[in-house]
Each structure stands twice: as C-alpha cells, then as structure tokens.
C-alpha cells in the first residue's frame, strides 16, 4: 500500500456541508479494496488561478489515503465522471 493525497475541486454552487458526504460514497471504492482513508479536509470555497469549466472559484477538498495504485486510479476515474467535480489531482507525498 502506498500513501496518496488527492486534491478535489468541486462546483462552487454546491453547499459546503454536503461535500464530505458526497465524497464519502466514492471513498467506499478505497475501503472496499482494503485501503484506508486517513482524513478528508474540506478547505472551503477558494478562488481558482484561472477559470476551469467556466468557474472562477471552487470548493477544495484534500483526501489523504493509503491504497494500491490500481485502486487509486479507479477512484480518480469515478471522481472525474461526476459533473459536480471540476478537477482532481492525485499526488504521492515524498515520492522521490
């Protein structure tokens, strides 16, 4: 298992309190394959550096998890299928 950080930017029209529960259903992919979710940190509404899908701001969330690479790839694929998710970025902390 490897450690990952996933940054998710969601549509700013969503309610901030609904972000964590909506992400939780996607996190079941990680849990089902034996991975663990360390934390889900919702940063709230922030301004984007440039417009993405005609949005000048978005709701940021950072997810720290441990999982196999194939599981994280499937998790990211499912997130990108959701229309309310503007952008995702998967990172490996200290992977050098």
UniProtKB/Swiss-Prot annotation:
Keywords, sorted A to Z: Ribonucleoprotein, Ribosomal protein, RNA-binding, rRNA-binding
CDD domains linked to this entry: bS6 (cd00473)
InterPro entries assigned to the protein according to its UniProt record, in alphabetical order: Ribosomal_bS6 (IPR000529), Ribosomal_bS6_sf (IPR035980), Ribosomal_S6_plastid/chlpt (IPR020814), Transl_elong_EF1B/ribsomal_bS6 (IPR014717)
Pfam families assigned to the protein according to its UniProt record, in alphabetical order: Ribosomal_S6
Gene Ontology terms for molecular function: small ribosomal subunit rRNA binding; structural constituent of ribosome
GO BP terms, alphabetized: translation
Source domain of life: Bacteria
One annotated Gene Ontology cellular component of this protein: ribosome
SUPFAM superfamilies: Ribosomal protein S6
PANTHER family: MITOCHONDRIAL 28S RIBOSOMAL PROTEIN S6, SMALL RIBOSOMAL SUBUNIT PROTEIN BS6M
Cited function: Binds together with bS18 to 16S ribosomal RNA.
Family: Belongs to the bacterial ribosomal protein bS6 family.
Protein name: Small ribosomal subunit protein bS6
Organism: Nocardioides sp. (strain ATCC BAA-499 / JS614)
Classification lineage: Bacteria, Bacillati, Actinomycetota, Actinomycetes, Propionibacteriales
């Amino acid at each position: 298992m490897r450690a990952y950080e996933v940054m998710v930017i969601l549509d700013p029209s969503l309610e901030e309190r609904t972000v964590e529960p909506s992400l939780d259903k996607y996190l079941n992919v990680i849990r089902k394959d034996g991975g663990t979710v360390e934390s889900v940190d919702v940063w709230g509404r922030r301004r984007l550096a440039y417009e993405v899908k005609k949005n000048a701001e978005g709701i940021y969330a950072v997810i720290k998890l441990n999982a196999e690479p194939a599981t994280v790839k499937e998790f990211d694929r499912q997130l990108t299928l959701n229309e309310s998710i503007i952008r995702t970025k998967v990172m490996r902390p200290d992977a050098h």
